[in-house]
Every structure is written in C-alpha cells, then in structure tokens.
C-alpha cells in the first residue's frame, strides 16, 4: 500500500512540475496542457489527497467520509459542466447555420431584384396602355464604333429594322439619333405588355391573400344546422283472391320488392285478383264470341302422331274470313285439319271481325289464302295451313274467271290433278271459259290423303295415279313435282287436250304423238306465211288461234279458216319422241314443235310426203329476216322476182353443191354470199370421207362456169337444184345479196378479174396472177363434192382444207419468187 502511494506521489510530482514549470510560462499567456480541464481538476484533487495522506497516515472515519463526499461533488460538477458545454456548442452551431442560410437567402433575393432591375426598362410600368409603335431600352449602352447609338435605361425608341438577330436599327426619340443597339437591350411592346401583366397578377394575388375569413362562430352554427327529416310512407297490398301457398309466397316476395322500390316516392299500389272486373269480363266475352263463331279452331294433337291409311268422312266449315276448314273423322274421333290455329295469321283478325264474311276483307283473304307461295313455306312447320290452302282452292276455283285465252293457257289451271280421267269433248267451243263443275274437297276415293310422318312431321301428298296435261307452248311437264298440285279444278279443260295425250305417272312420263288432220289444199295466188310466235306466246294445238271472249263469232270463224303455211305445218306436225331423251324425273314438253329453217317456197314446191318424211331435231331455231323483210312472204316474193318466175320445182338431193365464189376486184370479197359456216350446211349421216390433201377435187373447174347478165342467177339456181337438205332453203344473207345486185352492176372490170382468177387456177405457174390473188384478195376454194357431215367436225374440216390450199399457194409463190431472182 505504501509502495503504491509512493509511486503515485512520484507521478503526481512529475505532473505538477510539468504544469508549473516557470520556463514554460510567459506573460499574459495561457497555460497549455495535454489534459482537459476536467482531467486537470481530477489530478489536482488526487495530488491534494496524496499529500494529506503522507502527512497523516492514520485517517479517521470522518476524514474518509469527507473525502468521499468531496469526490462525489467533484464528479457531479464535472458531469454538469460536460452537459452544459455540449448544449452550448449545439446552440452556437445552430445560430451559425441559421445566420449563414439567412445571408444566402438575402443575397439571392438581392441578386434577383438587381437582375430584374437590369433587364427591365423600369422597375414598374406606370402606363396602363402599351403603345405598340415604340420600343424601350432595358439597360444602358455606350457606342463603341461608328454606327452605334448611346442609350440609357428606359429610353423610348422607334424600331426601324429588326432583320438582324443581334443588332437592331433604332431611332432615339429624345435626340432623334439613328444607330444600332444590341437586340437583347431592347424591350418590344409584347415583352413590355407581358411584364405589365406580371405586376398586375402579383398585385392581384397579394390582395386575394388578404381576404378575411368568416368568424368561427358562424362556421360552427352552419355545421351544426340539422338536416331535414324525410317521412317514409308505408304501402300495403291487399289480395282478395284465394290462391295456393306457392302463389302467395311469390306474390308476397313481389309485394316486398315493390314496397322497397316505390316507398320513397309515396306511391300506393293495389293488387286485385277479383274475377268480376270489367277488363276480365270483356276479355271473357270476346273469348266466348271467338269460340262460338269458329268452333273448328281447336288444338289438334293427333296430327303430331302418324296415320297412313284410313277411310275418312269429311265435312266443310267456313271461318269468318271465308277460309274453308276441312275436318276429318279419324277412328270415330272428330278432329280438325286446321290445328294450332294460333300460328295462323288470320286467327286474331277473325276474332276481331266476326261479321266480315260478306265484306271485301273476306274476298281479299280468299285470294290470299289461295296463294300457294303463302302456304307453301309454312306447310312443314304447320300442316294445317296446307289443308286450309287446299280447301280454299276448291272454293276459289269455282268462282274464278279467266280474262283471255292467252291467260287461260298460261295459267296454272293447265295441269289437273285427279284420280280418274274424264271424257274430253274435241268439238267443244273454243271460247268457253274454264269453269269447272262441282267437285268435292275431299272425295271418298281420298286422292289427297295427308300422309303425316311421325319422325319428320312433314306433310307429303301421295302422287296421283295420272296427271292430265293440256298442250301449251308455255307449259313444261318438267315442272311437275310431287310437292303439291298447282291447282285443283273440278273438271279438265274441255277442248284444250285431245284424248290420246296422257301422262301415266310422275316418274315415267310418255308423250304420245298427236296427229292433226291438215288440209293439203293450197291457195292459188298467195304465198304461205307462217304465224309469228315467240317463246312466251302459247300455240294451241287446235285449229287456228283462240280469240278473246270479247271478239265476235265472225273473227272466230276466220281464225278457224286460217291458211296453214309449210312452217306452220311443220310446227304442228308431231313426231315420236325418243325414249333416250326421257328421264325419271323430267320429260320433254307435251307439245312437240318442229320449226323448219326459212326456205324458199313456191306454190308447186309443197309436198306433204316430203314434209312428213322429213326428220329434223326437236329444237326451235328463230332467226330474224334479213334485208328489212317483215315476213317470209315478202322475202319469197322478192326471191321469185329475181328468179324471173322460175317454175322449176325444188328437188331434194343427197349431195350438197356449193358453187365457186366469184371474187369482186373492188371489194376483194366473194360476190356470192354463200357461207361455208357449219350452221348453213345440212347434216347427213353418210360415211364417206374426203382426204384434205386432194386439192384438185376441192377447187371448182372454171370451165363449168358460164357468164350471164346476172352472175347470181346461175349460182342461185345451181344451189337451189343441188341443195342437199330435204327441205329447200335460201339463206337470209343470200337473199339480201340478191336484192342488192342487179344486171347493171356487172362491169368489165369484174369480168377481167374473174378471167384472171380462172387463168390462175388453170395455170398456177402464172406469177402475176398468183401474186395478185394472194396479195390483194386471197383465194377461197369451195367444195363441189359430196361429203359426209358428222356433227361439229364440219367447221374444223373446212378450216383445215382452206388453210392447206392457201399454204400450198403461198409456198408456190415463194418458190417462184426465188427462182426469178
């Protein structure tokens, strides 16, 4: 213990010596130490205690307690000193920071104010209106070179030129000096106006910030004001009817929903199910009237099933609109064919107009009900509509009238559907209207039995045993289908159909030939002209054309005595139809028409045996008359004049002879208009063949040609005498060419041309003729041999022959030209 005290005392002495060294002290200087003030105090107290302990080693308890208390006091004072120093330092630092920030802020404001003062011509603009004719200097400028002008801040100037972006030419208003100033030193009127608005806006914002707020007590009173109370009105519902529990539950839910939705509006809704209301009574009376007026409108469920064959008894009832409803008795239960009448478009209308049977509405609806297109699309969805359509067709057919024979022949009444044939009267009057006799809607034989399938639920009509078809140009039996008859007549058309034409079934139609008795007597001094007809104009198979009902009997007698021309004889001559042209579903037209080509007829050239033996394909070829002729008679009359009343009969040969064409030098076209096309060459079924390489047989010898005053006479007579068709004909273009030329048209130039052509044909080595022929007009060789014509190969054969002829001539010409060189 002593040793430790001595060591510590030695250390303390060293410390004291270092601190109290007189050499280290100076005048008016502060003692510097390596210890802090707190450490220095501690060291001083420690030194004092050591000194006191060395002097008096035995220490009393009181002295120890005093020393302990002193130590506590010293430690307390040191901690307090430390806390005070820290707080003081913080306060000093904060003050310094605040002062620095304030200084910086003040410096920025001053700088900004100075900057604005420098850029603006004046710190504030006093004038309220800016004059756009002047500019102002926003800072001062001193001229350094000649051409510049001095300006002070706020000077008013007139801008003379601002084309340069850096220097503007101005005129000073104070001394009228003219010079250049930097553009950035000049304030334009728009810039001055913007600065004025800036000052005004700042003043306005400052004034708005000074607006006084309302007193607090007023605000509290406004917030504490009570809101208005809304009165909710309760709505009750009463129901007087006795209903089941389920209905009551649903109604209660509905009432509760209505209560929630309409209570706010103060509405009152009553629910009443009483059956004695006027509305229900009116509705009940209307429904009773509907039932009494149309008892046949009932739901039919049996038709939705299936029944194939039954013996039915029927009766008819008429709806308010005149629609006949056919009711059938099936297995003792009476049902109605007009089932599910709710789908009918006339159900509501019939209930609204119960007395419309004798009105015009009933007549209109009868015609609508008779339309097949209206009911045809609805038969698959509702079979009762079709039965209603059938019933109305029976009624409308008895009262329908046809205006004219043309409409009669074009109407759908031409096709009759019946189970048995009725006898025909061939001598009936032609102007008799088509009025069928009485006919029951559904007969006992059950021709139109409704076969309703369970699976498909579609109505299909059983095909009748036979169908009687009237002969008409516009009627085509290919339109006959198994859907439904076009019309139901009570009896077939009298006088419109011969007895020997019938159709046995829909799948196998056979058209029998109709032979008419035609008088062979021909008029004496009159050429026969056929009737003009078209595809839309029907031709009746009876004598003549039927006249309208309004024409008198005299016109009808004249129509019966119309003279028949050869073309009309051919048209009315019926020929058997090949079985190969028939199919299962379609057949040819019931009236077979044969139309001959337009031929030249004379009084003595008609031979009935020739016409009857002439077999021509069953097709109609209509061509217009050439040369402006309105009829065949005018054309033939002109032809007879050109032929100088030639009485030579027309003979039918098996060979076809076409003379050599005569070329016209001026027009370089054949003088004969006979064409080598396929449609003008009759077809024959011979098996001869001619080689295309034999050119000598294809070129007509010029020795056989003889000249006459009319060069066409010989060629025309030769063709008419050697025509291969069994029916004589003259092409319409040929007739027009004959009419165009006359005897005076044959000139010496044409004869010279023909002579040179003949010389060239005889002597192909003639270079001049060959060159002239090929260069100017070309050569077309015509055939003078008999040849088989098979179908469509005629045109191709002729083209090949002509091409070979021209090719040979061209080769010869080229070889001759090469040799002459």
UniProtKB/Swiss-Prot annotation:
The modification Phosphoserine is found at residue 36. Residues 1-11, 21-31, 53-67, 333-350, 473-484 have a biased composition (Polar residues). The modification Phosphotyrosine is found at residues 35, 40. Residues 283-292, 554-563, 675-687 have a biased composition (Basic and acidic residues). Residues 268-282, 529-541, 665-674 have a biased composition (Low complexity). Residues 130-191 form the SH3 domain. GO terms for cellular component: cell cortex of cell tip; cell division site; cell tip; lateral cell cortex; microtubule cytoskeleton; microtubule plus-end; non-growing cell tip; old growing cell tip. Gene3D superfamilies: SH3 Domains (2.30.30.40). Residues 599-821 are annotated as: Interaction with win1. InterPro entries: Polarity_Bud-Selection_Reg, SH3-like_dom_sf, SH3_domain. The keyword GTP-binding does not apply. One of its GO terms (molecular function) is cytoskeletal anchor activity. Pfam families: SH3_1. One of its GO terms (biological process) is establishment or maintenance of actin cytoskeleton polarity. It is found in: Cytoplasm, Cytoskeleton. Keywords: Cytoplasm, Cytoskeleton, Phosphoprotein, SH3 domain. SMART domains: SH3. Residues 1-36, 51-79, 267-292, 333-352, 473-500, 529-570, 664-697 are annotated as: Disordered. Residues 527-821 are annotated as: Interaction with tea1. Its main location: cytoplasm. Cell polarity factor essential for the bipolar localization and function of structures containing the cell-end marker tea1 during the normal cell cycle. Regulates cell polarity in complex with tea1 and together with the stress signaling MAPK cascade, contributes to cell polarity maintenance under stress conditions. Required for the localization of for3 at the cell tip specifically during initiation of bipolar growth. An essential component of the tea1 cell-end complex. Interacts with win1, tea1 and for3. Interacts with tip1 in the presence of tea1. This is Tip elongation aberrant protein Tea4. It comes from Schizosaccharomyces pombe (strain 972 / ATCC 24843) (Fission yeast). The gene is tea4.
